[in-house]
UniProtKB/Swiss-Prot annotation:
One of its GO terms (cellular component) is cytosol. This is GMP synthase [glutamine-hydrolyzing]. Residues 17-206 form the Glutamine amidotransferase type-1 domain. It catalyses: XMP + L-glutamine + ATP + H2O = GMP + L-glutamate + AMP + diphosphate + 2 H(+). Pathway: Purine metabolism; GMP biosynthesis; GMP from XMP (L-Gln route): step 1/1. NCBIfam families: guaA_Cterm (TIGR00884), guaA_Nterm (TIGR00888), PRK00074.1 (NF000848). The gene is GUA1. Its cofactor is Mg(2+). It comes from Debaryomyces hansenii (strain ATCC 36239 / CBS 767 / BCRC 21394 / JCM 1990 / NBRC 0083 / IGC 2968). The lineage of its organism: Eukaryota, Fungi, Dikarya, Ascomycota, Saccharomycotina.
């Protein structure tokens, strides 16, 4: 058992860490994911990070790609203090050009752009970065290229359009590659990244959820102390449940969970959540039925952003009121608020591109901190979704809940397009239940990352028996993804869709037509609103 007094508050001080400096590439988060896949902890920070402000020393540094040109005014550049750390450095695409620019400025616009697959020709197989890597397909995505070899570097690999597709200065342990090893289109990309992290950086591959849980429990105990009380909102989803379970293991009944039933949940959801969290996991849970309040506030509202804000604001009011009723047996005041932040949320907030135009308002309990004067505790903020699931299984969270598809904070309010009424919710609930039921019967539930039925605000002509009908339309959506930052639509067999559509039209009153959404993310988001 880990002694709480011996555990640093920062995970990067516990595990060997590769630092990924993000220059704004759409692939930057994949670098972090790939490293963790072979149990090396990696953390992403913006390329503007001042090295002097780091409170920990990385085992190695990776400079990501980016949509800029190093020679243009206003382009981002890395803090040159990275070279004072004397750790291995790998530059990818823009990151390689940044290294070349710093070491001689030999970067210019290419004669032609190189996007897509290319054949990599390894010229120097003795390079430690390319151990086990041979001539193979790689993924290129660049318009600029090196036109001269930087001082102290040698050519390791070429492509038809890139005479400097890979370069190295092994004396200084600095490497540059023009292609993207983090994407699956680069056939031996994982081998290359593993060589860098484990062989060159000598990072320990001890980043496992088994090691994380002991460290995290001790970290929570150190942060919270022996007497402080913690509250947290739970939804029955894997993130909030695993977060609640960690708190239960760390501080026992000093953690108080609150479940707000807003009337926008899936079929029989509240009953299932209560049974799982109390009887199954022993969590101290309070359930609040606020259905009438939420549906009353949503009456007549059709704009999705307004719906989200109404739900978020009223959630805060209900949560605050219920939290005020909690009187810990210890006599202590509530000091901390549990929040289920995951690492993709962190990446989104620190990406070098910065906060972009608001696509959707995130439904969380951030507003509670200022209102309730609570300190935040986020036990899952270093984890990707798949890591949270693995952690849940280790901690004894029921398998069905661990692998349950995500459900949005605003619930069915953003799956009922247009005004939310009890009647519309009933249609959406029943259609969704049939869809998920058929997915489970087909043995596809675990193959699909998220699936749901959305009720559209349009009507369509149909025929039931000898009668003409004019009823609503259900849109089915199912996606595949590893991190929910990008997603592809799931390809069902036609027979499955035919059976599901038939059941929905015949069993759900008010539905005349069923469609299937075949849009990927991007350009679409997962949810319709």
């Amino acid at each position: 058992m880990v002694n709480p007094a011996d555990v640093p508050i920062e995970v990067s001080k516990v595990f060997d860490t590769i630092l990924v400096l993000d220059f704004g590439s759409q692939y930057s988060h994949l670098i972090t994911r790939r490293l963790r896949e072979f149990n090396v902890y990696a953390e992403m920070l913006p390329c503007t990070q001042k090295i002097s402000e780091l409170t920990w020393k990385p085992k190695g540094i990776i400079l990501s790609g980016g949509p800029y040109s190093v020679y243009e005014d206003g382009s981002p550049h890395v803090d040159h203090d990275i070279f004072k750390l004397n750790v291995p450095i790998l530059g990818i695409c823009y990151g390689m050009q940044e290294l070349a620019w710093i070491n001689g400025k030999g970067v210019a616009r290419g004669d032609k752009r190189e996007y897509g697959p290319a054949t990599l020709n390894v010229e120097d197989s003795s390079c430690s970065l390319f151990k086990g890597v041979d001539h193979s397909q790689v993924w290129m995505s660049h318009g600029d290229k090196l036109h001269a070899l930087p001082t102290g570097f040698k050519v390791v690999a070429t492509s038809d359009n890139s005479p400097f597709a890979a370069i190295s200065n092994e004396k200084e342990n600095i490497f540059g590659i023009q292609f993207h090893p983090e994407v699956t289109h680069t056939k031996q990309g994982k081998v290359l990244l593993r060589n860098f992290a484990i062989d060159i950086c000598q990072a320990s591959n001890n980043w496992t959820m088994e090691n994380f849980i002991d460290t995290e429990i001790a970290r929570i105990q150190k942060l919270v102390g022996p007497t402080a009380e913690v509250i947290g909102a739970v939804s029955g989803g894997v993130d909030s449940t695993v977060g609640a379970k960690i708190m239960k293991e760390a501080i026992g009944d000093r953690f108080h969970a609150i479940y707000v039933d807003n009337g926008l949940m899936r079929l029989n959801e509240t009953e299932q959540v209560y049974k799982t969290l109390t009887e199954g996991l022993g969590i101290n849970l309070t359930v609040v039925d606020a259905t009438d309040l939420f549906l009353g506030k949503l009456q007549g509202v059709t704009d999705p952003e307004k719906k989200r804000k109404i739900i978020g604001n009223n959630f805060i009011h209900v949560f605050e009121a219920e939290a005020a009723k909690i009187k810990p047996a210890s006599g202590q005041e509530i000091e901390y608020l549990l929040q289920g932040t995951l690492y993709p949320d962190v990446i989104e907030s620190i990406s070098f591109k910065g906060p972009s135009q608001t696509i959707k308002t995130h439904h969380n309990v951030g507003g509670l901190l200022e209102d309730m004067k609570l300190k935040l505790i986020e036990p899952l903020r270093e984890l990707f979704k798949d890591e949270v699931r693995h952690l849940g299984e280790i901690m004894g969270v029921p398998h069905d809940l661990v692998w349950r598809h995500p459900f949005p904070g605003p619930g069915l309010a953003i799956r009922v397009l247009g005004e939310v009424t009890r009647e519309q919710l009933k249609i959406a609930r029943e259609a969704d239940n049939i869809f998920i039921e058929e997915i489970r019967k087909a043995g596809l539930y675990k193959d699909i990352s998220q699936a749901f039925a959305a009720l559209l605000p349009v009507k369509s002509v149909g025929v039931m028996g000898d009668q003409r009908t004019y009823e609503q339309v259900i849109a089915l959506r199912a996606i595949e993804t590893t991190d929910f930052m990008t997603a592809d639509w799931f390809v069902f067999e036609a027979a499955f869709l035919k059976k599901t559509a038939s059941r929905i039209v015949n069993e759900v009153d008010g539905v005349a037509r069923v469609t299937y959404d075949i849009t990927s993310k991007p350009p679409a988001t997962v949810e319709w609103e």
